[in-house]
Structure formats: C-alpha cells, structure tokens
Amino acid sequence: MSLTRLLIRDFRNIETADLALSPGFNFLVGANGSGKTSVLEAIYTLGHGRAFRSLQIGRVIRHEQEAFVLHGRLQGEERETAIGLTKDKQGDSKVRIDGTDGHKVAELAHLMPMQLITPEGFTLLNGGPKYRRAFLDWGCFHNEPGFFTAWSNLKRLLKQRNAALRQVTRYEQLRPWDKELIPLAEQISTWRAEYSAGIAADMDDTCKQFLPEFSLTFSFQRGWEKETEYAEVLERNFERDRQLTYTAHGPHKADLRIRADGAPVEDTLSRGQLKLLMCALRLAQGEFLTRESGRRCLYLIDDFASELDDERRGLLASRLKATQSQVFVSAISAEHVIDMSDENSKMFTVEKGKITD
C-alpha cells in the first residue's frame, strides 16, 4: 500500500500543502529549517497519532492555530482507503477512515506500516532497552493480531499492580492482579521470542552486507530469568518489589541485546557504522514483514546524507529500491539524492513551509 496523496494543514511551519505522491521515491529538498522534516513528521503522525520530534502537541500545531489536520489516500492492490487525523491543543484526536469517525490510532498504524530513519534514531542502538522493545513490538503488532490488545492490558495491569505494591503487606493480596498478569506476560514474551527468532536471518544477512567487517549477534532477553516461571519470579521478589514500589521483572524489562565482535555496539561502532546498522535493522524488519504478510513498509528517511559516504549511500539506496516500497527522503541538496531518482520519482522543493514540485 502506498500513500498517493497527502493533505497537511497547520502542522509545524506548514500552513497548507496538498501533495500528489509517487509510489516509489519522493525527495524533499530544502535548507535546514525549511520544513522538509515536517513533511516526514506529518506522514509519521498520520500513521502513529503522534510526532517523532516532540510529544508536546503545542509544538506540533502551527503557531496561533487550534489544531492540525492531516488527510491521506492509501492505494492498495485492490482498493483505495481515505484516512484522516485531527488533533487539537488539548491533545484530543479524531481519526477518520473512509469517511467514518470513531476509529482508533492503532487502525492507522495497521494500515500504514512504516520505518523511520532519522539522525536521532541511534537510540535504537545506544539508548535504553525500551527502544529495542519498541522494535520488537512493532514486529509483533504487525504479525500477531492479538498483540495490541494483550500489550495494552499488560500495561494496565502493571500500573495497577505497582499502585497496589504501595499498600499491600502480603503477597496473597497481589494474587488477583498476578492471576491476570502472568498469562499475558508469558504470551507477550512468547510472541517477542518468536519474532526475534523469525527475523534473525534477515537481520544477519542485511548486517553482513552493510557491515561485513563485524560479527554481529542478537539475543532476546525476556525480562526475567531463563527456565523460571514468571509466577515464581513475582512471588519470590515480592518484598523487593514492595520496597521499590514497582515490578522489577517482566516483559516490560525485556531487551534485544546487540553486540559487535562480542562487545556492545555502542562501544564498538563509529557514528557512521551505527547509522548503517540502524538502516540495516529497519530494512530487515520491513523485508520480513513483506515476506510474511505480503505488505510493504513505507520508509521515512530524514537527512539522508548525514554520517554516510558515497559508497554507503549507494548501498542504502539500492537496498531501498529493491524493496519496491514507497520511500520519502529529505536532503539539504538535490545532489545528495539525484543518483537515486528515476522516471517514477518525485522531487519536492521545500522553503519556509511552502512545498513545490
């Protein structure tokens, strides 16, 4: 599925824009601060309900306006789908699909699987475990129909359990929460483990092409001890959890550990190599989705040329083209992306929030 049309109104520094898009490569060229990243962010927000540069809604809505409006048309193999998202300064959202209101942001996310590559995306590799959990959970969300509901219920139960830890004195008082929590935790952990095992070959193959000089390993850590039942872990750690006033073990502590030549990648790789690894992982994830479901990702790449030399840019471009996916690329200069362009591409110029093609 590709985004054939995008309407942006009062988003960041963009007053209004109506863009007819290519199903292949779309290039956004302009100086820093021109608004090219805002276009990428608008697409991301349309598919996620939130921006990737700021969680503060007031910074995303254009100055002195009350709300932003985003509309898109998605073209699939058999049908076209109209989608829309409006969000006001109070953070209230309205999702519209094919002319009807009352839909959830998760429905947009399912319709628009996308991969985001930005200069800030190094957190996937050198940030905390939550970023790598998000990587795994993206895959589980798009591969397991029941994942989102289970994950939402898990978050709710953990919040309730942590609140109860401030009041209870005996483990038996926690059993009502744990009775619901344990099967959810085990199911989510199983899905994550299966996903990490399934995508392992894709990650390995892509990383060997991007970083052949390193031996990279990936290991899923579920968040509690191996070969130990989660019920046993919760009961055994009750006193410690009560002192901490939060649940110290579980799927909310899971991680995907990534090592290069046996050492953490953040201690071994340069910034350019970290970007290559990040790109390799995002590509592997998108390609795995296509192979498993027949659905293609939409790729958003901000500041394409940063951290990469000509050879590595060429490698990334060729791999992106091979996916046959829709790709959006921002760059300061057209020279950085001209080699990627073909007769099906579209080149947009962005200046002070105005977009022309």
From Swiss-Prot:
UniProt GO MF annotations: ATP binding; single-stranded DNA binding
Name used for this protein in its record: DNA replication and repair protein RecF
Species per Swiss-Prot/TrEMBL record: Shigella flexneri
HAMAP family listed in its UniProt record: RecF
Main location: cytoplasm
Gene symbol of the encoding locus: recF
Family label: Belongs to the RecF family.
SUPFAM superfamilies in the cross-refs: P-loop containing nucleoside triphosphate hydrolases
Coiled coil stretches, renumbered: none
Stored PROSITE patterns: RECF_1, RECF_2
Ligand binding (ATP): G30, A31, N32, G33, S34, G35, K36, T37
Subcellular location: Cytoplasm
Record function comment: The RecF protein is involved in DNA metabolism; it is required for DNA replication and normal SOS inducibility. RecF binds preferentially to single-stranded, linear DNA. It also seems to bind ATP.
